[in-house]
Amino acid sequence: MDILLNKPITIVGGGLAGSALALLLGQKGFPIQVIEKRPKQSENIRARSINLALSDRGVKTLTKTGYVDDILKIAIPMKGRMIHSLDSVQTFQAYSSDSNKHLYSVSRQLLNDRLREHTEKLENVKFIFSDACKSIDLKQCTIQTQDSNQTIEASTIIGCDGAFSAVRGSMVKLDRQDYSQSYLKHGYKELCIPSGPNQTFQIDKNSLHIWPRGSFMMIALPNIDGSFTCTLFFPFDGPLSFSSLDTREKVDQFFKDYFPDAYKLMPDLLDDYFENPTSSLVTVKTEPYHYQGKVVLVGDAAHAIVPFYGQGMNAAFEDVLELFNCFEDKSLYPSSTDKPFDNDHFNNIYKKYQENRKANSDAIAEMAVENFFEMRDHVGDALFLFKKKVEHLLEVKFPSRYISRYELISFSTQPYAYAQKIGLANQQILNELVKGNDDYNIEKIDLVLADQLIKKYLNK
């Protein structure tokens, strides 16, 4: 069905969500314009070479674009976590009892470039670079740009402009627009483990590496050039914090003391530490996601989350696919092919999109914060490791009945809210199964009791 639009759909933000949505809608023939504040050729890529974990949810959206195989060429499979202890002992924790399941490490910049390249091939999609959205006029459905100071007209506006969204900033001035933001007391800084000779990997390439140290931690994800992008999650203030590590000598000694194996592999550590920015970790919630068919929020603009389930990008891509599916729902289309799409039709689409996404977005936001404390405090803990072993045992012995929360989040497309509910039940099962097993002996796990507990808590 041909859709008539008097003005283009305008997407604010040409990042991952904005580019993916422009690609999908553009492939269907919608006239699209994308306003992106950054230049077409990003500068200082290394300082912003943030890596992301791509899971099944994101892969599903990329598959819909038709370019998933091309995109996975720049990704590296990660089969589990590699935990680095203070004495440099490494312990591998598989993500799943199924060895065929894995996450992908992918550079945000490279992924964004691929999506944008494919989108720019479409004649009905136009990018406007180096021009930020300053504000929007909700009544007129227009955008005032910051750099060129022009007024851009749109049939509808889709805000994909991140956690500090200018589109959302205009919406929160409305009556009955809920909004909240919550910061962790930790921030993060990107660092690097370079490749070895001939672009070899200096630590295991198929793992997400974690150095848990109680009140702080460091992680590292592999790059296709053999390097690793490291992220230090660290308190902003306190005896050991970003504020206290204020000299090269202090930083050098800190990494020698707390990350001795990584320290030996980071020749540019001090330059990276003082040149790269320290960024905050924020959870953002707002409701509603839309206003009268004139504007809708997608991804971080609607629900920024902390990165500790590796789901920020995946949740945003899931938003994109859900919104696209709503655009494809013919029951929401104009009844006549010669009638232009109007605000009523967009409003129907956006209402359905929010109904399907809000509870799930809230769920993953809450679980991401929980997982921060798990990764920081417990991944090196003996009881935590034992529970993981028991969980894998249950997945093998009861494959259709017991599925871990992590499995549901990372290796399925089941709703996040469902994964949260199942995760609570799973914890009750695990707590009862390990009770009294003080020597953490997997052979002592009572599978008959496990069967009874699964029936009791999961109704399976």
Curated annotation (Swiss-Prot):
Annotated Gene Ontology cellular component terms = mitochondrial outer membrane
Q: Which cofactors does it use?
A: FAD
Its recorded reaction(s) are:
L-kynurenine + NADPH + O2 + H(+) = 3-hydroxy-L-kynurenine + NADP(+) + H2O
Q: What class of enzyme is it?
A: oxidoreductase
Per UniProt, what is one GO molecular function of this protein?
Answer: FAD binding
E.C. code: 1.14.13.9
The subcellular location is:
Mitochondrion
What biological-process terms (Gene Ontology) are attached?
'de novo' NAD biosynthetic process from L-tryptophan; anthranilate metabolic process; kynurenine metabolic process; L-tryptophan catabolic process; NAD metabolic process; quinolinate biosynthetic process
Q: Could you name the domain of life of the organism this protein comes from?
A: Eukaryota
Kindly indicate whether the keyword DNA repair belongs to this entry. Answer: no
Q: Which InterPro entries match?
A: FAD-bd (IPR002938), FAD/NAD-bd_sf (IPR036188), Kynurenine_monooxygenase (IPR027545)
The annotated pathway is:
Cofactor biosynthesis; NAD(+) biosynthesis; quinolinate from L-kynurenine: step 1/3
Chief site of localization: mitochondrion
Q: What does this protein do?
A: Catalyzes the hydroxylation of L-kynurenine (L-Kyn) to form 3-hydroxy-L-kynurenine (L-3OHKyn). Required for synthesis of quinolinic acid.
Instruction: Please give the family membership noted in the entry.
Output: Belongs to the aromatic-ring hydroxylase family. KMO subfamily.
**What is the recorded name of this protein?**
Kynurenine 3-monooxygenase
Q: Which organism is it from?
A: Dictyostelium discoideum
